[in-house]
Amino acid sequence: MTIADHQARILPLFKKLTSLSPDPLPEAERDPRLKGVGFLPRGTLFSCFHEEHLAEAETLAEALVEAKNFDDFIALATNARAVVNEGLYAFAMSVAILSRDDCNGVVLPPIQEVFPDRFVPAETINRALKVDKVSDPNKDTVVPIQKTGNIRDPEYNVAYFREDIGINSHHWHWHLVYPAFYDADIFGKIKDRKGELFYYMHQQMCARYDCERLSVGLQRMIPFQNLDDELEGYSPHLRSLVSGLSYGSRPAGMHLRDINDCSVQDMERWRERILDAIHTGLVTDSHGKEIKLTEENGLNILGALIESSHDSVNKPFYGTLHNWGHVMIARIHDADGRYRTNPGVMDDTSTSLRDPIFYRYHRWMDNIFQEYKHRLPSYTHQQLDFPGVRISRVTVRSKVPNLIHTYSKDSLLELSHGINLKGHIQVKYEHLDHEPYNYEIEVDNRTGEARETCVRIFLAPKYDELGNRLILEEQRRLYIELDKFHRRLEPGKNVLVRASGDSSVTLSKVPTFEELESGNANVNPNEYCSCGWPEHMLVPRGKERGMDFYLFVMLTDYEEDKVQGAGEQTICSDAVSYCGAKDQKYPDKKAMGYPFDRPIQVRTPSQFKTPNMAFQEIIIQYEGHKH
């Protein structure tokens, strides 16, 4: 059977999951391999942050991965679809598809079409359901998306970012590729530097969010600091079609409260133990043995502890700080479940980015990681330099050199694959985008021989919310990675050109359900893995009058950076910076975020710069809505 045949048999299993029968298959009709699943009731919201939900998802994913061949896998998946919770099924099934060798090249259907109720406001879906009853089923009908707030709430100014379908889909897919329960011994594939990727991907989301806040005239976010902080209010305007209930809203001024499975005191205890480990440079494993946090492994160990994942060296002692925090915030309005309400959006990876507290909470997590980073020495001139290689000029080639235009545009989302409709109803929604551009890097190779180089490109705002120039130590945590790629430098002058659409951070194209069904998806199965930052959100919005940014370009020695066992032709090479390379080593020896991952003692770019670096001032200008 071909990849297309496998794709065609998998897609129907993701259709209409919001409309499954509430009653599971009787036990007598269940595959005996499904003995350990079916405990989370259908019609309730699944959370991959909740220990019990995660344990059941792990059991199902393992059973699906262990199916003896593809036909057996499809038979077991079909049986499981009629047994387990709807959200749990989609999660475990997706993890299994990404893990099975006979599913290599199969593209997961976009989660926004599988569960559109997680991405589209309830008012819009309600309108679509009404329109569907009276519209011609043979014609496409378009319903405009409804707004979820207004300018009385300053945070609504960045709703375009928080509610972006692409970034919420990215977060869902990242946690599929790196599920907390992942055990390499069972699934048989490595997840290299998983703990460090957990840190870096979320750190980058926070940096991007702050860039967007500065773009719309808001101050940078204030981190969540203490577990007794009062939280801001938030109403998601989402209603689950699986449960029939709205996602929980949070009035302003509420505090975290104990939930049935975890107390606020547990969270405080875990945080202090993790900080103790950072400050002593030692973690204690479950056998009482001390493990040193080195420059090479420290962040990876801490990432696993903080999340915490299967790789945590001592989960009973260091706890599950990140995951239980998500659940605790999501249940703040009904901590002990007495009102039988749905949790808030923080409970789910495909919805949590909508809530402003997500970014403040993750900046708190990032501050813990930064405690560790501050214990490492700053990079020396020798560690930063690439002797004999000098960047003479960097230019962004667009309509106007060193000026990138951004704008808002409309796109359509099909509802009929996820919701039981008689016709084709599409939602028209607005999202940020940017004009395509190229990086043009002029390099002088004075080594007298051809050299291989890794090109690293970052972007950060030049000024803070008050118009003051940011010093490098403040600015380094705002640097967002735009691209990283490998090139050969011939002796003498070289001009390196790279298109923005080729970024190692972004997904170039997300195929729709319809394109996957028809076989017209037009994606290279060896490159596409669903995990990656959306291409339309590569650069921040900027301001109508233009906003000043530093474009940072650095060339490093590829011979020092390359990793044994990380091939040039990687499976899923579309977005390796945030998602890694599937089943292979992370293709870069340097720390993620290098050279901005460690404290910087000097204040300005000119003091930090080595000849193999360039800080180019550019402007990003927002042009409004494009029809």
Curated annotation (Swiss-Prot):
InterPro entries named in the record: Di-copper_centre_dom_sf, Hemocyanin/hexamerin, Hemocyanin/hexamerin_mid_dom, Hemocyanin_C, Hemocyanin_C_sf, Hemocyanin_N, Hemocyanin_N_sf, Ig_E-set
Subcellular location(s) per record: Secreted, Extracellular space
Tagged with keyword Cell membrane: no
CC terms in the record's Gene Ontology section: extracellular region
UniProt keyword terms in alphabetical order: Copper, Disulfide bond, Glycoprotein, Metal-binding, Oxygen transport, Secreted, Transport
Keyword Transport carried by entry: yes
Disulfide bonds: C531-C579
UniProt binding sites for Cu cation 1: H171, H175, H202
GO molecular function: chloride ion binding; copper ion binding; oxidoreductase activity; oxygen carrier activity
Binding site for Cu cation 2: H322, H326, H362
Chief localisation class: secreted
Positions bearing carbohydrate: N445
Sections of the chain in a coiled coil: none
Tissues of expression: Hemolymph.
Oligomer status and interactors: Tarantula hemocyanin is a 24-chain polymer with seven different chains identified.
Family: Belongs to the tyrosinase family. Hemocyanin subfamily.
Note: The two copper ions bound each have 3 nitrogen ligands (presumably contributed by His residues) and share a bridging ligand (possibly contributed by a Tyr residue) in addition to binding oxygen.
Role: Hemocyanins are copper-containing oxygen carriers occurring freely dissolved in the hemolymph of many mollusks and arthropods.
Protein name: Hemocyanin D chain
Organism: Aphonopelma sp. (American tarantula)
Highest classification ranks of the organism: Eukaryota, Metazoa, Ecdysozoa, Arthropoda, Chelicerata
Gene that this sequence comes from: HCD
